Amino acid sequence: MGLLSLYNETSGKVSWELYRFSIIYITISNHTNIERRSDLKIVVGVKQVPDSAARLVAVDGKANWGDSPLIINPWDEYAVEAALQQAEANNGSVTAISIGGESSKEALKHALAMGCSDAILISDEALAHMDSQVTSRVLAGGIKKLGDVDLAFLGRQAIDTDTGLTAAQTAHLLGWPALTLVVVISNIDTAARTIKVERSAEEGRFTVSARLPAVLSIVKDFGEPRYPSFMGIRKASRAEIPVWSLADLALGELKPTVSWPEIMNPPQREITTEMITGATPQEIAETLADKIMAEKIL
């Protein structure tokens, strides 16, 4: 089009065509810079669970934790720590999200006290019974509503259900890479939109790279989470935490695909203890070996 104008039109027409092209080029460049911003927008999922010292018992086929206090899921503290480290290194922000009732705000306040910028509670009566798939759909909906999220961090698993599926399922619903069991975050290139991590495995560690955005689950070998600071605790205590419903996330009826119709206590086992004595260590060892062979343990 420009060459045709140069051949047939006046020089004023040609100059206008070149000038218009320059404007288009600058607009595209600016748009690209917006898409590849240098800061990171991070989400971390946290859950309110019974204290790790609590004992689960079955009462009338239902799980009962007694009067155990509620705490932030210990695995999620490692996820919060990982998220905060990346935010600090990349001029980013961290928003904590929890799904549950009013008491779940305590887990969010713990995350705020550790250093998270914001917190959001997703609560709805329809979420009284959830499995990992429902949890993942709600979490993915919250991430989509926030918009422009680069990284989502989750703990390895929750200590009350121990499924360890939420990170992978959330990544699948978002269409993002799932980087699970992360021990080290080696590099994040905000310009190239890539991340490199080390994953824990029985065979050792694997180095994996992926495109952003991505979902990560963090294991405790990542490093000890920081303690909430005094100023952080004060700030968190005054924080107004917004509450989103399923309607806010444009999610319809969510039905769990897995149900727990009944929970049973394991049968009681009778355990007896016998002290083996002898005049010498060799005699004791021989007696122990005879008993092990007699019981066919080996």
Q: What would you call each of these model-derived segments?
A:
Residues Y7, Y19-F21, Y25:
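Aromatic (phenylalanine/tyrosine) cluster motif
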Residues Y25-I26, T32-L298:
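N-terminal glycine-rich FAD/FM-binding segment characteristic of electron-transfer flavoproteins
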